[in-house]
């Protein structure tokens, strides 16, 4: 149940960020270029004091994950995939 609540919270934050991005783009006018996929990073930080279902799946407390457009940054490793605006990207995590 906690896993479902955590995933729902992550989804809501992501959707809110995308909505703010789209409303900001509408305010800027038609002249502006749309940001590239690399600029639309979504970060997720997992912190749990006790063992959770996410830890059983491999997500450890204190891990910082970012949805990257292409390659993981220095000190990060590919830990799966994520989707932004229907485009699949690399999920990069570091401790």
Curated annotation (Swiss-Prot):
Subcellular location, record wording: Secreted
Entry keyword Disulfide bond: yes
Keywords: Antibiotic, Antimicrobial, Defensin, Disulfide bond, Secreted, Signal
Propeptide: 20-62
UniProt record, GO biological process: antibacterial humoral response; antimicrobial humoral immune response mediated by antimicrobial peptide; cellular response to lipopolysaccharide; defense response to Gram-negative bacterium; defense response to Gram-positive bacterium; disruption of plasma membrane integrity in another organism; innate immune response in mucosa
Cysteine pairs bridged by disulfides in the record: 65-93, 67-82, 72-92
Protein's UniProt keywords contain Disulfide bond: yes
UniProt xrefs under InterPro entries: Alpha-defensin (IPR016327), Alpha-defensin_C (IPR006081), Alpha-defensin_N (IPR002366), Beta/alpha-defensin_C (IPR006080)
Top-rank lineage group of the source organism: Eukaryota
Signal sequence annotation: 1-19
PANTHER family, sorted: ALPHA-DEFENSIN 1
Family in the record: Belongs to the alpha-defensin family.
Chain's role: Microbicidal activity.
Protein's UniProt name: Neutrophil antibiotic peptide NP-5
Species this chain originates from: Oryctolagus cuniculus
């Amino acid at each position: 149940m906690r896993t479902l609540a955590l995933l729902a919270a992550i989804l809501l934050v992501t959707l809110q960020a995308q909505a703010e991005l789209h409303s900001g783009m509408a305010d800027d006018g038609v002249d502006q270029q749309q940001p590239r996929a690399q600029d639309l990073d979504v970060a997720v930080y997992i912190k749990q004091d006790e063992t959770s279902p996410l830890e059983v799946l491999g997500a450890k407390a204190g891990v910082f994950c970012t949805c990257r457009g292409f390659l993981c940054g220095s000190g990060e490793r590919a830990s799966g995939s994520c989707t932004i605006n229907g485009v699949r990207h690399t999920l990069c995590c570091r401790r």
